[in-house]
Amino acid sequence: MFARTFTVVVAVLCLVGTTAFAQPQSAEPSSVILFENVRIFDGKSDTLSGSMNVLVRGNTIDRISKDPIPTDRSANTKIIAGGGRTLMPGLIDMHWHTMLVRPTVAALLAGDIGYLNLMAGAEATDTLMRGFTTVRDMGGPAFGLKRAIDEGTIPGPRIYPSGAIITVTSGHGDFRQPFEVPRVLGAPQSRGEQTGAAMVADSPDEVRVRVREQLLLGATQVKLTAGGGVASPHSPLDASTFTEAELRAAVEAAENWGTYVAVHAYTPISIQRAIAAGVKCIEHGHLMDEQTAKLIAEKGIWLSTQAFPDEMADAFPPGSLERAKAFEVFAGTDRTFALAKKYRIKTAFGTDILFSPRLAPRQGELLAKLVRWYTPAETLAMATGTNAELLALSGKRNPYLGKLGVIEHGALADVLLVDGDPIANIKLIEDPAKNFVVIMKDGKIFKNTL
């Protein structure tokens, strides 16, 4: 229902105009695009290249050369004079909630579905215009929006959807009200379940069903909540939710489809139990201890974590339990990144912006905050080449054939032309409207101010 509703309302919007969305130019369908005289950040290196030329043919990078690249200079060829600017891969946010960025919790649980979809569509366009050409959606009904973007109905980033967050009764993501308890098998689903935001599962068998449902709908990976969370009113941070057997059931179901499970987890016990069950990626980890960090490193588990700003707590009322939990998590940020660096944990960058249209425009700023722990080059590499490595864990469930996060021959042409050197001045990414002069996704130009 969510996907059908979204398709209808977006089609109507296209008929009456698109003033509700940010205003990228129409994607230019040139079959050959040549960037001349650019310095390249390739998504891996510590420094920029010298002056180079990059040829994009169709949706892939066809040639990179320090020598001039000849073209037929026909109407199908577009030449972009780089003027020594930086060409870099499009940014990747590994913990995004496409449908949950702008609405309040109350609007999500009680608002009109068509309205929520239109808000998400507008935010998707703005996300692309901030230079984030790919997001990994870590919970919510993003399948319809992904389809609309992929079909060209609306501009937006590539989406790797997880589908509904899978939780337990009383777990993070169970937004039922007290009058909705007890949960009766066969009874109508809660509002959160009806929208596809979250699904409750209370046994290994139920977990298998819920995981398989999300895979049927098109999930590229699956997310479970292994412990308590900030936004859920009945889920204390110290709580461990799924049993190891339940988590293992999810892992087996996902592996049968050639993909992996990521879990929301803050505490040592939640993280350790998930790793024992075969989970491949920990989301957050802000309250982990040194022993747990060692285990993550030894097992080669991914840590997808965030440098939360204090303003993120503004989504919750002053004096609320949720707000208090938020600051408890924020206090662990510095230690989390320090442990990740100390033990060389495979670390991915994401923002996890929720219920805050004011914070969403600061997506690049949250990336730039990582220079507190990493060099600018390491920070940019994390948000491009490193994040793309984690995306590749989805295996054959990967919806986008080709390599992301790098500037190299054969890679998908998701690139940004930056007016300056972001390694020397990473704050350039905080103002994409000014400093990202070209935004290209899948070989199509969505912004060109040159």
Language model features with spans:
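Bacterial N-terminal signal peptides
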Residues: 6-18
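Boundary at the C-terminal end of the N-terminal hydrophobic targeting segment
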Residues: 20-29
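Histidine-rich, glycine-flanked metal-binding segment
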Residues: 26, 40, 44-88
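Divalent metal-coordination and catalytic microenvironments
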Residues: 38, 54, 59, 84, ...
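Metal-associated gating/positioning segment near the N- to mid-region
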Residues: 85-151, 169-178, 183, 245, ...
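Active-site mouth loops of central-metabolism enzymes
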Residues: 105-118, 189-209, 260-262
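Active-site core of metal-dependent hydrolases
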Residues: 162, 169, 224-335, 346-348, ...
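His/Asp/Glu-enriched, well-ordered alpha-helical/loop segment
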Residues: 256, 330-422
